[in-house]
């Protein structure tokens, strides 16, 4: 974005600021900082430096996108919104925008530069300010202008959240009474993805056998032993039920810890993706929290992301059980007929106890 902004003549390239903040960020890229195993006092410096770097990087990209936006043709019928895709691949995904609207609209109409009506949803309206969701499709490293105005919302009408179930054109998801995912049925392939009686769930191991490094050392016998499901004070509600995005909210507790999850499907975006957003107030001590996915897919090996590559690993063994994976892991059937990929934002420890999990 900064290169484009400079090319258009609107902004000098911020090389000094980028170098300074990149070096500040790299200062803390080593194992004690990243894994949370430094002494508590050191994190006074770590958090401060990371927050400064993050804030200044955000300012840099916001300033650059703003400079480019001012150079674009934003003459549209409604309120113009510029969407920037910073990655080197095309994207079609849900965008959240805040726009001015004098009156609360009954619906939202979003139009692309090509005149295509995009799926959209009104989240809220208060005091002339509307929060809107819409689907944007943007080429790699590119900018696109969209028009937002009151109007009829484009929808297939096949997105629904109710009574612990969530459904779109591809999946039907059912939760059990504990708030765990008991079923994911792929309607297009006529296939159940969750093992019968073994839901996708949060699980906790409370036996910590490490005496030297209890903050990070994990024993295989602990992972092979009993686990606790998070099932206290379960509340399942519908968080969203719009034409573009629908979500179930699951709230649970365990002792002093509180767990809130949002399970989300879309209609008109990346509809084959199930999103689970976690908001945890973790007060546990001497405990390990994991998410478990017992699938109906079988393979002795799973594939793990390494950032610039990938690696295949087998089931847990005595000297390799808690393993590294960056942002995704994939389990594809032996005959390559079907597969599931689990993407995650910031947790890099995985284990594979059997062919299906």
Regions found by a protein language model. Give the residues of each.
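Metal- or metallocofactor-binding catalytic centers and their adjacent structured scaffolds
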Residues: 1-72, 77
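C-terminal (or distal) subdomains of carbohydrate-active enzymes
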Residues: 55-58, 62, 66, 70-357
């Amino acid at each position: 974005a900064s290169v484009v902004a400079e090319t258009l003549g609107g902004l000098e390239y911020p090389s000094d600021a980028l170098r300074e903040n990149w070096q500040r960020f790299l200062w803390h890229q080593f194992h004690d900082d990243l894994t949370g195993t430094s002494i508590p006092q050191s994190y006074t410096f770590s958090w401060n430096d990371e927050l400064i770097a993050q804030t200044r990087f955000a300012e840099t990209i916001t300033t650059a996108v703003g400079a480019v936006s001012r150079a674009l043709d934003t003459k549209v019928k409604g309120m113009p919104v510029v969407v920037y895709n910073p990655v080197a691949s095309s994207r079609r995904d849900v965008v959240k925008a805040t726009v001015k609207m004098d009156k609360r609209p009954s619906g939202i109409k979003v139009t692309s530069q090509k005149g295509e009506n995009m799926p959209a949803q009104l989240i809220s309206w208060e005091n002339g300010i509307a929060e809107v969701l819409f689907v944007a499709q943007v080429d790699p490293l590119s900018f696109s202008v969209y028009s937002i105005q009151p109007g009829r919302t484009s929808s297939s009408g096949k997105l629904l959240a109710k009574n612990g179930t969530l459904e779109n054109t591809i999946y039907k998801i059912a939760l059990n009474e504990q708030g765990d995912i008991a079923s994911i049925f792929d309607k297009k392939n006529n296939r159940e993805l969750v093992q019968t009686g073994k839901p996708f769930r949060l699980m906790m191991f409370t036996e910590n056998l490490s005496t030297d490094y209890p903050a990070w050392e994990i024993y295989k016998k602990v992972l092979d032993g009993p686990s606790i499901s998070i099932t206290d004070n379960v509340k399942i509600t519908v968080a969203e039920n719009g034409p573009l995005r629908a979500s179930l909210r699951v709230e649970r507790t365990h002792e002093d810890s509180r767990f809130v999850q949002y399970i989300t499907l879309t209609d008109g975006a990346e509809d084959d993706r199930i999103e689970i957003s976690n908001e945890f107030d973790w007060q546990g001590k001497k405990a390990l929290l994991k998410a478990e996915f017992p699938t109906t897919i079988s393979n002795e090996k799973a594939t793990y992301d390494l950032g610039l590559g990938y690696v295949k690993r087998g089931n847990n063994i005595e000297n390799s059980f808690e393993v590294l994976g960056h942002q995704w892991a994939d389990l594809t059937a032996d005959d390559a007929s079907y597969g599931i990929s689990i993407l995650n934002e910031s947790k890099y420890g995985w284990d594979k106890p059997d062919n299906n999990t």
